[in-house]
C-alpha cells in the first residue's frame, strides 16, 4: 500500500507507508491443480485470437461501516468520479492477454481451513481436514470480497472425495482486474492528515500478474478546497499503478517475455530487476527502463538503470525524486499541475512482462531533460551546474514556470534543493492571485492563464538619481520569481508582457529590459514554448485566442421533479453533480471546465478553457463534440430523490478581437445546430433517454 501526500505547505513531510503496508497484505495466487479449465486456458499459449487487449478494470464500491453521522457524501462523490476517470485512462494505456471466461479470485486456505492432512503418503496430503469455524469470507485491505467473485472450497477426508462446502461463484465477466473501492476515515487517514488515498494489490494470477486490489480514500480529506478533481485523479492513478505492478513487493515477480505477450512459452521470471551501482544507489535495471532514462537524459546508448528512492529500504516502490522530479511514481505529490505520466514509468510496465504499453500516452517530463548522466547526483546538485537545482533559501520559479517557488529541500532530496511552489497564491496562471492596483504592483506582475514565472527584479518605483545604469542600480533587489504574460512566436521563442508595457521579445538564456521599469527580466532557456505549435494566445485585455484555444461558456437548462425547489447549498451540490456528468460525457479531464454555477431558475453554466498542463483535445474540438452529443442525448443526473434532465444547451465563444470571425463562427454554428436538430428529431421521438449516474460500474 502506498500513501501519497498532498503537499499543502510546499514541503514533503513524513514517510511513505507503501512498503510496510503492502508487505502486510497476503498475496494470493491460485494453485494450478485447483484452477478451473477456463482459467488455465487463459494462461497457456493459444492461437492468435488471444492477442493483448485493453486492460478491463471492473470496480466495486462498498461503503465502509461507519456511524451515519460520519458518512461523507461529498468525499464519496469525488472519489467515485476520480476512479471512473482513472480506470478509463488506464484502459487506454495498458493491454493484457484477456482472461477467458469469468474472473474468479482465490480463497485463502489459511483463513477457511484450521488444519490439513499431514501424511505425505495419503492422497489428500495438504488438503483441508478441519474447517475454521470463525471463517467469515475473504477481504482485500479491509474491503469484503463478495462470494460471487470467489472460488469455492471443500472439506477433504483422509481418503476419498471431498465434501463441497461452498461452490464457485459465477465470477466477473469481461474483467482482467478487480478494483475494490472504499471511502472511509481509517486509522491511517487519522494519523496522516495529508493522505488522499492508499492502495494495495491482493491477488495474482498463475504468472503473478495482479488480478485484484483495493483503494481506500480518506473521505474527510477529500473535502479540502485546495484539492481539485485532477489532484484526486492523479493520486488515484499513482495508487493504481502501485496495485498493478509498480511495487517493491512485485518487482521480483516481473517476467521476461522476449517474444511478446502472446508467446507465453518463451516467458520466464526476470533474473535481476534491481541492483546497486558503484555508488551504492539502488537501481531498477530492466532494459526498457534503462533505455528510456538514457533517452530522457540525452545519453547515447543505455544506462545501468533508473535510481529508486531508498528512504524506506531496499523494497522501494518509487523513483528517486532528485532524478525524476514530477514523475507520477515519485514518493511525493506536488499536485496534478506538476505531475506527469512519464515515459520511464511506462517503460517499467513494459518490462513487467504482464502488459503491452501504449507509449504514445506518455507525457513529456521536463525535469532533467537532456542533462546528461551525472544529473541528479548528490555530488553535483549543489555545485550550480544545473539550474534545475538551487542553493540557499531564496524565492524563484518552479521549474515548470507555472508557479513562484521557494528554494527548499526534504528528506527524499538528500540535501539537494529545488524551487517548490509556495503554500498559497503562487500560481501565475490564476487571475485571482493578482494585485488590484498599480500602486500595489510596483513589479508590474500580471496573473493570467497565459502568465508564467520569470526571474526578474523589475520595479516602476523611482530609484537613486545618481545611477546612470538603471538595470544595474544598487537600489535594485536581487532577482526573484514574478508573474508575467508570455506568448509563443515559434518553437523555443516567445515574447513577454509586463503591466503597461508592449510585447517584448524574450531571447531564451538572455535578460531583457522593459520600457517604464528599472531592472531586468531573465528569459528561461529550454522551459517554455518547447513545441512547434505556432503563436499561442496570451495577450492583454481584450483577450484573444487561437481557434484551437477558444474561451467558451456552456449553458444548460435543467428540468426536474415538479415542485422540487433547491436552496443555495443544494444548487452548489447539483452543479458539482452536473459537472461530473459533463466531464464523463466529454471523456476528458476536468481541467477544461471552470466555475460551475446553477441559478434559481435551474440554468447550469460553466466556463471552458484549458488549464496549464491540461492534456487532451483543443477546446474547439471539445466544443464541437459537446454541441453534437448534448443535442442527441441530454444529460440526466440524480440529486437526492430528484432527477434532472438537460432541456437545451448553448455554447458561447468569446472572440472579441475579431468581430467578423465571431459572426462567421456563430453563423456556422447556428446552421450546424439546425442541421443536427432536423436530423435528430425523428430519432429523438423513439429514443429512450439513458440514465447517467455518476459512479463506477458495479457489475
UniProtKB/Swiss-Prot annotation:
One Pfam family of this chain: Peptidase_M8
Transmembrane segments: 664-684
GO CC terms of this entry: membrane
Residues annotated as binding Zn(2+): 238, 242, 318
Active site: 239
Cofactor detail note: Binds 1 zinc ion per subunit.
Top EC group: hydrolase
EC number(s) on file: 3.4.24.-
Residues annotated as signal peptide: 1-18
Residues on Extracellular side: 19-663
Tissue specificity comment: Specifically expressed in ciliated left-right organizer.
UniProt cofactor(s): Zn(2+)
InterPro entries: Peptidase_M8 (IPR001577)
Its job: Putative metalloproteinase that plays a role in left-right patterning process.
Family: Belongs to the peptidase M8 family.
Protein name: Ciliated left-right organizer metallopeptidase
